[in-house]
Amino acid sequence: SIFEYNGSAVVAMVGKNCFAIASDRRLGVQLQTIATDFQRISKIHDRVFIGLSGLATDVQTLYQRLVFRHKLYQLREERDMKPETFASLVSAILYEKRFGPYLCQPVIAGLGDDDKPFICTMDSIGAKELAKDFVVSGTASESLYGACEAMYKPDMEAEELFETISQALLSSVDRDCLSGWGGHVYIVTPTEIKERILKGRMD
Amino acid sequence: MSRRYDSRTTIFSPEGRLYQVEYAMEAIGNAGSAIGILSKDGVVLIGEKKVTSKLLQTSTSAEKMYKIDDHVACAVAGIMSDANILINTARVQAQRYTFMYQEPMPVEQLVQSLCDTKQGYTQFGGLRPFGVSFLFAGWDKHHGFQLYMSDPSGNYGGWKAAAVGANNQAAQSILKQDYKDDATREEAVELALKVLTKTMDSTSLTSEKLELAEVYLTPSKTVKYHVHSPESLTKLLVKHGVTQPAAETS
Protein backbone atom coordinates (compact mmCIF):
# COMPACT_ATOMS: atom_id res chain seq x y z
CA SER A 1 0.00 0.00 0.00
CA ILE A 2 1.22 3.48 -0.85
CA PHE A 3 0.25 4.57 2.69
CA GLU A 4 3.02 2.29 3.96
CA TYR A 5 5.71 3.50 1.56
CA ASN A 6 7.43 5.94 3.94
CA GLY A 7 6.23 4.58 7.30
CA SER A 8 4.65 6.70 10.00
CA ALA A 9 3.08 6.84 13.43
CA VAL A 10 0.98 9.74 14.67
CA VAL A 11 -1.02 9.92 17.88
CA ALA A 12 -2.93 12.63 19.78
CA MET A 13 -4.33 12.51 23.32
CA VAL A 14 -6.61 14.69 25.35
CA GLY A 15 -5.76 15.74 28.92
CA LYS A 16 -7.31 18.16 31.39
CA ASN A 17 -7.47 21.51 29.54
CA CYS A 18 -4.55 20.36 27.40
CA PHE A 19 -3.66 17.98 24.64
CA ALA A 20 -0.63 16.17 23.31
CA ILE A 21 0.27 15.21 19.77
CA ALA A 22 3.22 13.02 18.87
CA SER A 23 4.79 11.31 15.88
CA ASP A 24 7.80 9.20 14.97
CA ARG A 25 10.74 10.75 13.09
CA ARG A 26 11.53 8.15 10.45
CA LEU A 27 11.33 8.78 6.73
CA GLY A 28 11.91 5.57 4.85
CA VAL A 29 11.52 4.18 1.38
CA GLN A 30 9.97 0.86 2.19
CA LEU A 31 12.56 -0.89 4.41
CA GLN A 32 15.43 1.55 3.80
CA THR A 33 15.69 4.55 6.11
CA ILE A 34 16.31 7.89 4.35
CA ALA A 35 16.07 10.40 7.19
CA THR A 36 15.63 10.33 10.95
CA ASP A 37 14.46 13.89 11.49
CA PHE A 38 11.28 14.01 9.45
CA GLN A 39 8.54 16.35 10.66
CA ARG A 40 4.99 15.07 10.43
CA ILE A 41 3.48 17.43 12.99
CA SER A 42 3.03 21.10 12.15
CA LYS A 43 1.71 24.06 14.02
CA ILE A 44 -1.17 25.87 12.33
CA HIS A 45 -1.37 28.50 15.05
CA ASP A 46 -0.65 28.57 18.80
CA ARG A 47 -3.64 26.37 19.61
CA VAL A 48 -4.05 24.06 16.63
CA PHE A 49 -1.68 21.34 15.43
CA ILE A 50 -1.92 18.85 12.64
CA GLY A 51 -0.06 15.57 12.25
CA LEU A 52 -0.10 13.92 8.84
CA SER A 53 0.71 10.26 8.42
CA GLY A 54 1.10 8.58 5.06
CA LEU A 55 3.02 9.46 1.90
CA ALA A 56 5.64 12.09 2.79
CA THR A 57 5.36 14.11 -0.43
CA ASP A 58 1.61 14.49 0.01
CA VAL A 59 2.13 15.28 3.70
CA GLN A 60 4.21 18.31 2.73
CA THR A 61 1.99 19.49 -0.10
CA LEU A 62 -1.20 19.13 1.92
CA TYR A 63 0.38 21.04 4.80
CA GLN A 64 1.38 23.88 2.45
CA ARG A 65 -2.15 24.08 1.08
CA LEU A 66 -3.57 24.19 4.59
CA VAL A 67 -1.23 27.03 5.53
CA PHE A 68 -2.37 28.89 2.41
CA ARG A 69 -6.04 28.55 3.28
CA HIS A 70 -5.55 29.29 6.96
CA LYS A 71 -3.53 32.41 6.24
CA LEU A 72 -6.25 33.83 4.01
CA TYR A 73 -8.81 33.03 6.72
CA GLN A 74 -6.66 34.83 9.31
CA LEU A 75 -6.34 37.92 7.15
CA ARG A 76 -10.03 38.09 6.27
CA GLU A 77 -11.47 37.27 9.69
CA GLU A 78 -8.70 38.81 11.78
CA ARG A 79 -8.65 35.80 14.10
CA ASP A 80 -7.34 32.25 14.23
CA MET A 81 -9.40 29.28 13.14
CA LYS A 82 -11.18 27.20 15.77
CA PRO A 83 -10.04 23.56 15.82
CA GLU A 84 -13.50 22.35 14.71
CA THR A 85 -13.45 24.79 11.78
CA PHE A 86 -9.95 23.74 10.83
CA ALA A 87 -10.96 20.06 10.86
CA SER A 88 -13.81 20.84 8.49
CA LEU A 89 -11.41 22.73 6.22
CA VAL A 90 -9.03 19.76 6.09
CA SER A 91 -11.95 17.45 5.41
CA ALA A 92 -13.23 19.67 2.58
CA ILE A 93 -9.77 19.97 0.97
CA LEU A 94 -9.33 16.19 1.09
CA TYR A 95 -12.75 15.50 -0.38
CA GLU A 96 -12.05 17.89 -3.26
CA LYS A 97 -9.60 15.23 -4.37
CA ARG A 98 -12.12 12.40 -3.87
CA PHE A 99 -10.98 10.41 -6.92
CA GLY A 100 -7.25 11.12 -6.70
CA PRO A 101 -6.71 11.70 -3.02
CA TYR A 102 -3.78 13.03 -1.00
CA LEU A 103 -2.36 9.84 0.40
CA CYS A 104 -2.36 10.91 4.04
CA GLN A 105 -4.41 10.40 7.14
CA PRO A 106 -4.50 13.57 9.22
CA VAL A 107 -4.69 13.87 12.99
CA ILE A 108 -5.91 17.25 14.19
CA ALA A 109 -5.59 18.47 17.76
CA GLY A 110 -6.44 21.87 19.17
CA LEU A 111 -7.70 23.92 22.08
CA GLY A 112 -11.04 25.71 21.70
CA ASP A 113 -11.94 29.16 23.00
CA ASP A 114 -12.91 27.79 26.42
CA ASP A 115 -9.64 25.80 26.60
CA LYS A 116 -11.56 22.64 25.78
CA PRO A 117 -9.31 20.21 23.92
CA PHE A 118 -10.43 18.85 20.56
CA ILE A 119 -8.96 15.92 18.68
CA CYS A 120 -10.01 14.22 15.51
CA THR A 121 -8.68 12.10 12.71
CA MET A 122 -9.92 11.37 9.23
CA ASP A 123 -9.19 9.12 6.28
CA SER A 124 -7.53 10.25 3.07
CA ILE A 125 -10.83 11.47 1.58
CA GLY A 126 -11.86 13.50 4.60
CA ALA A 127 -14.30 11.39 6.59
CA LYS A 128 -14.01 12.84 10.08
CA GLU A 129 -13.78 10.66 13.16
CA LEU A 130 -14.07 12.54 16.44
CA ALA A 131 -12.89 11.08 19.73
CA LYS A 132 -12.94 12.10 23.38
CA ASP A 133 -9.77 10.31 24.43
CA PHE A 134 -7.13 9.61 21.78
CA VAL A 135 -6.70 9.21 18.03
CA VAL A 136 -4.02 7.34 16.08
CA SER A 137 -2.89 6.99 12.48
CA GLY A 138 -0.03 5.66 10.37
CA THR A 139 1.60 2.27 9.81
CA ALA A 140 1.90 1.78 13.57
CA SER A 141 -1.75 2.62 14.18
CA GLU A 142 -2.77 -0.89 15.19
CA SER A 143 -0.15 -1.18 17.90
CA LEU A 144 -0.87 2.42 18.92
CA TYR A 145 -4.50 1.53 19.49
CA GLY A 146 -3.43 -1.22 21.86
CA ALA A 147 -0.90 0.89 23.73
CA CYS A 148 -3.26 3.87 24.09
CA GLU A 149 -6.15 1.65 25.12
CA ALA A 150 -3.98 0.25 27.92
CA MET A 151 -2.23 3.44 29.10
CA TYR A 152 -4.80 6.22 28.64
CA LYS A 153 -6.61 7.72 31.63
CA PRO A 154 -9.03 10.63 31.39
CA ASP A 155 -8.18 14.12 32.72
CA MET A 156 -4.40 13.83 32.95
CA GLU A 157 -2.31 16.91 33.68
CA ALA A 158 0.26 18.07 31.11
CA GLU A 159 3.29 16.26 32.59
CA GLU A 160 1.53 12.91 33.04
CA LEU A 161 0.04 13.25 29.57
CA PHE A 162 3.52 13.72 28.13
CA GLU A 163 4.74 10.58 29.88
CA THR A 164 1.75 8.55 28.71
CA ILE A 165 1.82 9.63 25.06
CA SER A 166 5.60 9.12 24.88
CA GLN A 167 5.45 5.61 26.34
CA ALA A 168 2.54 4.72 24.07
CA LEU A 169 4.40 5.99 21.00
CA LEU A 170 7.74 4.37 21.80
CA SER A 171 6.31 0.98 22.67
CA SER A 172 4.13 0.99 19.55
CA VAL A 173 6.83 1.89 17.03
CA ASP A 174 9.01 -0.93 18.37
CA ARG A 175 6.35 -3.34 17.06
CA ASP A 176 6.37 -1.70 13.60
CA CYS A 177 9.20 -2.04 11.09
CA LEU A 178 8.34 1.08 9.12
CA SER A 179 8.12 3.73 11.84
CA GLY A 180 10.31 4.67 14.77
CA TRP A 181 13.75 6.28 15.17
CA GLY A 182 12.71 8.41 18.11
CA GLY A 183 9.73 10.66 18.50
CA HIS A 184 8.52 14.23 18.38
CA VAL A 185 6.06 15.30 21.07
CA TYR A 186 4.11 18.53 21.54
CA ILE A 187 2.23 19.24 24.77
CA VAL A 188 -0.12 22.21 24.44
CA THR A 189 -1.72 23.95 27.42
CA PRO A 190 -3.64 27.26 27.33
CA THR A 191 -0.46 29.07 28.38
CA GLU A 192 2.42 27.24 26.74
CA ILE A 193 3.58 24.87 24.03
CA LYS A 194 6.19 22.31 25.02
CA GLU A 195 8.09 20.58 22.26
CA ARG A 196 10.22 17.54 23.08
CA ILE A 197 12.28 15.16 21.00
CA LEU A 198 12.41 11.56 22.19
CA LYS A 199 15.16 9.03 21.71
CA GLY A 200 14.02 5.44 21.41
CA ARG A 201 15.45 2.38 19.74
CA MET A 202 17.45 4.08 17.02
CA ASP A 203 17.54 1.10 14.69
CA MET B 1 -19.23 66.97 -27.41
CA SER B 2 -16.82 66.26 -24.56
CA ARG B 3 -18.89 63.15 -23.77
CA ARG B 4 -17.47 61.59 -26.91
CA TYR B 5 -14.30 60.26 -25.28
CA ASP B 6 -15.75 59.83 -21.78
CA SER B 7 -18.03 56.89 -22.08
CA ARG B 8 -15.45 54.22 -22.82
CA THR B 9 -12.28 53.83 -20.84
CA THR B 10 -10.40 52.27 -23.70
CA ILE B 11 -10.48 55.34 -25.97
CA PHE B 12 -7.89 58.12 -26.00
CA SER B 13 -9.13 61.67 -26.40
CA PRO B 14 -7.55 63.78 -29.20
CA GLU B 15 -5.32 65.40 -26.56
CA GLY B 16 -4.03 61.94 -25.65
CA ARG B 17 -5.89 61.55 -22.37
CA LEU B 18 -7.98 58.77 -20.83
CA TYR B 19 -10.85 60.64 -19.23
CA GLN B 20 -12.31 57.76 -17.19
CA VAL B 21 -8.95 57.20 -15.56
CA GLU B 22 -8.66 60.88 -14.73
CA TYR B 23 -12.17 60.87 -13.26
CA ALA B 24 -11.21 57.89 -11.12
CA MET B 25 -8.28 59.89 -9.76
CA GLU B 26 -10.66 62.75 -9.12
CA ALA B 27 -12.86 60.43 -7.03
CA ILE B 28 -9.87 59.64 -4.85
CA GLY B 29 -9.20 63.34 -4.32
CA ASN B 30 -12.41 63.51 -2.30
CA ALA B 31 -11.69 60.47 -0.13
CA GLY B 32 -10.10 60.53 3.31
CA SER B 33 -6.36 60.97 2.91
CA ALA B 34 -3.54 58.63 3.81
CA ILE B 35 0.13 59.36 4.36
CA GLY B 36 3.08 57.00 4.35
CA ILE B 37 6.60 57.76 5.53
CA LEU B 38 9.70 55.62 5.24
CA SER B 39 12.18 55.76 8.08
CA LYS B 40 15.42 53.93 8.66
CA ASP B 41 13.86 51.41 11.09
CA GLY B 42 10.35 51.03 9.71
CA VAL B 43 7.48 52.39 7.68
CA VAL B 44 4.63 54.49 9.07
CA LEU B 45 1.14 54.63 7.58
CA ILE B 46 -1.46 57.07 8.77
CA GLY B 47 -5.02 57.49 7.51
CA GLU B 48 -7.82 59.95 7.99
CA LYS B 49 -11.22 58.39 8.61
CA LYS B 50 -14.14 60.41 7.35
CA VAL B 51 -16.83 60.25 10.03
CA THR B 52 -20.01 60.38 7.95
CA SER B 53 -22.54 60.18 10.76
CA LYS B 54 -22.32 59.60 14.47
CA LEU B 55 -25.16 57.12 14.12
CA LEU B 56 -23.00 54.88 11.98
CA GLN B 57 -21.66 51.90 13.85
CA THR B 58 -17.90 52.16 13.70
CA SER B 59 -16.29 48.92 12.65
CA THR B 60 -14.10 47.20 15.20
CA SER B 61 -11.26 46.58 12.80
CA ALA B 62 -9.20 49.07 10.89
CA GLU B 63 -11.07 50.75 8.03
CA LYS B 64 -8.20 52.09 5.98
CA MET B 65 -5.31 49.85 6.93
CA TYR B 66 -5.14 46.32 5.63
CA LYS B 67 -2.61 43.61 6.26
CA ILE B 68 -1.75 41.87 2.99
CA ASP B 69 0.71 39.35 4.39
CA ASP B 70 2.95 39.14 7.46
CA HIS B 71 5.42 41.53 5.86
CA VAL B 72 3.20 43.89 3.81
CA ALA B 73 0.35 46.24 4.72
CA CYS B 74 -1.47 48.93 2.82
CA ALA B 75 -3.45 52.10 3.37
CA VAL B 76 -6.38 52.88 1.07
CA ALA B 77 -7.81 56.08 -0.36
CA GLY B 78 -10.81 55.90 -2.66
CA ILE B 79 -13.85 53.71 -3.14
CA MET B 80 -13.74 51.08 -0.43
CA SER B 81 -15.79 48.48 -2.30
CA ASP B 82 -13.30 48.63 -5.17
CA ALA B 83 -10.44 48.45 -2.71
CA ASN B 84 -11.79 45.31 -1.07
CA ILE B 85 -11.63 43.47 -4.38
CA LEU B 86 -8.03 44.49 -4.94
CA ILE B 87 -6.97 43.72 -1.36
CA ASN B 88 -8.43 40.27 -1.71
CA THR B 89 -6.53 39.59 -4.92
CA ALA B 90 -3.35 40.93 -3.33
CA ARG B 91 -3.71 38.57 -0.37
CA VAL B 92 -4.33 35.59 -2.62
CA GLN B 93 -1.32 36.54 -4.80
CA ALA B 94 0.93 36.77 -1.74
CA GLN B 95 -0.19 33.36 -0.46
CA ARG B 96 0.14 31.79 -3.90
CA TYR B 97 3.72 32.99 -4.07
CA THR B 98 4.44 31.55 -0.61
CA PHE B 99 2.83 28.24 -1.58
CA MET B 100 4.91 28.07 -4.72
CA TYR B 101 8.29 29.22 -3.42
CA GLN B 102 8.02 28.74 0.37
CA GLU B 103 9.20 32.27 1.09
CA PRO B 104 7.44 35.62 1.45
CA MET B 105 6.61 37.50 -1.76
CA PRO B 106 8.95 40.43 -2.51
CA VAL B 107 7.06 43.69 -1.87
CA GLU B 108 7.63 45.24 -5.28
CA GLN B 109 6.50 42.08 -7.05
CA LEU B 110 3.27 42.17 -5.06
CA VAL B 111 2.68 45.83 -5.87
CA GLN B 112 3.43 45.16 -9.50
CA SER B 113 1.00 42.26 -9.76
CA LEU B 114 -1.75 44.40 -8.26
CA CYS B 115 -0.97 47.28 -10.59
CA ASP B 116 -1.16 44.91 -13.57
CA THR B 117 -4.73 44.17 -12.50
CA LYS B 118 -5.49 47.87 -12.20
CA GLN B 119 -3.96 48.60 -15.58
CA GLY B 120 -6.07 45.92 -17.22
CA TYR B 121 -9.22 47.83 -16.33
CA THR B 122 -7.99 50.91 -18.19
CA GLN B 123 -7.54 49.02 -21.41
CA PHE B 124 -9.92 46.08 -21.80
CA GLY B 125 -13.70 45.55 -22.02
CA GLY B 126 -16.23 48.32 -21.29
CA LEU B 127 -15.41 48.30 -17.57
CA ARG B 128 -14.49 51.22 -15.37
CA PRO B 129 -11.10 51.47 -13.64
CA PHE B 130 -10.68 50.85 -9.91
CA GLY B 131 -11.21 54.12 -8.04
CA VAL B 132 -8.47 53.37 -5.56
CA SER B 133 -5.00 54.60 -4.66
CA PHE B 134 -2.86 52.52 -2.34
CA LEU B 135 0.10 53.12 -0.12
CA PHE B 136 2.01 49.90 0.45
CA ALA B 137 4.39 49.51 3.36
CA GLY B 138 6.54 46.44 3.62
CA TRP B 139 9.82 44.78 4.28
CA ASP B 140 11.66 42.13 2.29
CA LYS B 141 15.15 40.63 2.29
CA HIS B 142 16.02 42.23 -1.05
CA HIS B 143 15.40 45.92 -0.43
CA GLY B 144 14.56 46.22 3.29
CA PHE B 145 11.82 48.67 4.17
CA GLN B 146 9.80 49.97 1.26
CA LEU B 147 6.95 52.35 0.56
CA TYR B 148 5.00 52.31 -2.69
CA MET B 149 2.18 54.48 -4.00
CA SER B 150 -0.19 53.33 -6.75
CA ASP B 151 -3.02 55.08 -8.63
CA PRO B 152 -6.05 53.94 -10.72
CA SER B 153 -4.06 53.92 -13.96
CA GLY B 154 -1.84 51.18 -12.59
CA ASN B 155 1.16 53.42 -12.17
CA TYR B 156 3.29 52.81 -9.12
CA GLY B 157 6.50 54.12 -7.67
CA GLY B 158 8.71 53.74 -4.62
CA TRP B 159 8.67 56.75 -2.29
CA LYS B 160 10.38 58.01 0.85
CA ALA B 161 7.19 59.82 1.83
CA ALA B 162 3.89 59.91 -0.02
CA ALA B 163 0.31 61.08 0.35
CA VAL B 164 -2.93 60.02 -1.33
CA GLY B 165 -6.52 61.24 -1.05
CA ALA B 166 -7.91 64.66 -0.14
CA ASN B 167 -5.34 67.47 -0.14
CA ASN B 168 -2.57 65.15 -1.24
CA GLN B 169 -0.73 67.93 -3.05
CA ALA B 170 -0.56 70.11 0.07
CA ALA B 171 0.54 67.11 2.14
CA GLN B 172 3.12 66.14 -0.46
CA SER B 173 4.70 69.59 -0.43
CA ILE B 174 4.94 69.69 3.37
CA LEU B 175 6.50 66.25 3.31
CA LYS B 176 8.99 67.46 0.71
CA GLN B 177 10.01 70.31 2.98
CA ASP B 178 10.22 68.45 6.27
CA TYR B 179 11.30 64.94 5.34
CA LYS B 180 14.67 63.91 6.68
CA ASP B 181 16.55 60.93 5.28
CA ASP B 182 17.83 59.72 8.64
CA ALA B 183 14.56 60.00 10.51
CA THR B 184 13.63 57.32 13.05
CA ARG B 185 10.24 55.66 13.13
CA GLU B 186 9.19 57.84 16.05
CA GLU B 187 10.12 61.00 14.15
CA ALA B 188 8.24 59.70 11.12
CA VAL B 189 5.10 59.29 13.23
CA GLU B 190 5.50 62.84 14.49
CA LEU B 191 5.93 64.20 10.96
CA ALA B 192 2.92 62.23 9.69
CA LEU B 193 0.72 63.60 12.46
CA LYS B 194 1.98 67.12 11.82
CA VAL B 195 1.22 66.91 8.12
CA LEU B 196 -2.23 65.56 8.76
CA THR B 197 -3.12 68.39 11.19
CA LYS B 198 -2.29 70.87 8.47
CA THR B 199 -4.10 69.15 5.62
CA MET B 200 -7.23 67.91 7.37
CA ASP B 201 -10.40 70.04 7.34
CA SER B 202 -11.01 69.80 11.08
CA THR B 203 -8.70 71.74 13.37
CA SER B 204 -7.99 69.17 16.04
CA LEU B 205 -7.03 65.56 15.58
CA THR B 206 -8.74 62.89 17.63
CA SER B 207 -8.20 59.17 17.75
CA GLU B 208 -11.65 58.55 16.20
CA LYS B 209 -10.63 60.31 13.01
CA LEU B 210 -7.26 58.64 12.65
CA GLU B 211 -5.65 55.33 12.03
CA LEU B 212 -1.97 54.73 12.56
CA ALA B 213 -0.06 51.61 11.56
CA GLU B 214 3.61 50.72 11.54
CA VAL B 215 5.71 48.05 9.87
CA TYR B 216 9.01 47.32 11.60
CA LEU B 217 11.43 44.56 12.56
CA THR B 218 11.33 43.01 16.02
CA PRO B 219 14.64 42.34 17.79
CA SER B 220 14.37 38.73 16.56
CA LYS B 221 14.31 40.05 12.96
CA THR B 222 10.73 39.10 12.16
CA VAL B 223 8.52 41.67 10.44
CA LYS B 224 5.79 43.12 12.61
CA TYR B 225 2.70 44.98 11.49
CA HIS B 226 1.14 46.96 14.28
CA VAL B 227 -2.04 49.06 14.26
CA HIS B 228 -2.27 51.50 17.15
CA SER B 229 -5.27 51.25 19.48
CA PRO B 230 -7.34 54.42 20.00
CA GLU B 231 -5.81 54.72 23.50
CA SER B 232 -2.21 54.64 22.37
CA LEU B 233 -3.12 56.97 19.50
CA THR B 234 -4.58 59.51 21.94
CA LYS B 235 -1.38 59.28 23.99
CA LEU B 236 0.70 59.96 20.87
CA LEU B 237 -1.48 62.91 19.88
CA VAL B 238 -1.07 64.49 23.32
CA LYS B 239 2.67 63.75 23.35
CA HIS B 240 3.21 65.51 20.05
CA GLY B 241 0.86 68.33 21.04
CA VAL B 242 -1.37 68.10 17.98
CA THR B 243 -4.65 67.67 19.83
CA GLN B 244 -6.56 70.27 21.73
CA PRO B 245 -7.94 69.36 25.15
CA ALA B 246 -11.46 68.00 24.60
CA ALA B 247 -13.72 70.93 23.84
CA GLU B 248 -16.96 71.15 25.79
CA THR B 249 -19.89 70.13 23.67
CA SER B 250 -23.42 70.81 24.72
Swiss-Prot record, chain B:
There is a cross-link at residues 40, 64 (Glycyl lysine isopeptide (Lys-Gly) (interchain with G-Cter in ubiquitin)). The keyword Glycoprotein does not apply. InterPro entries: Ntn_hydrolases_N, Proteasome_alpha, Proteasome_alpha-type, Proteasome_asu_N, Proteasome_sua/b. It comes from the Eukaryota. GO terms for cellular component: cytosol; cytosolic ribosome; mitochondrion; nucleus; proteasome complex; proteasome core complex, alpha-subunit complex; vacuole. Coiled coil: none annotated. Keywords: Cytoplasm, Isopeptide bond, Nucleus, Proteasome, Ubl conjugation. Disulfide bonds: none annotated. It is found in: Cytoplasm; Nucleus. Pfam families: Proteasome, Proteasome_A_N. Ubiquitous low levels, higher expression in siliques and flowers. GO terms for biological process: ubiquitin-dependent protein catabolic process. PANTHER family: PROTEASOME SUBUNIT ALPHA/BETA. Belongs to the peptidase T1A family. Component of the 20S core complex of the 26S proteasome. The 26S proteasome is composed of a core protease (CP), known as the 20S proteasome, capped at one or both ends by the 19S regulatory particle (RP/PA700). The 20S proteasome core is composed of 28 subunits that are arranged in four stacked rings, resulting in a barrel-shaped structure. The two end rings are each formed by seven alpha subunits, and the two central rings are each formed by seven beta subunits. The catalytic chamber with the active sites is on the inside of the barrel. The proteasome is a multicatalytic proteinase complex which is characterized by its ability to cleave peptides with Arg, Phe, Tyr, Leu, and Glu adjacent to the leaving group at neutral or slightly basic pH. The proteasome has an ATP-dependent proteolytic activity. This is Proteasome subunit alpha type-4-A. It comes from Arabidopsis thaliana. The lineage of its organism: Eukaryota, Viridiplantae, Streptophyta, Embryophyta, Tracheophyta.
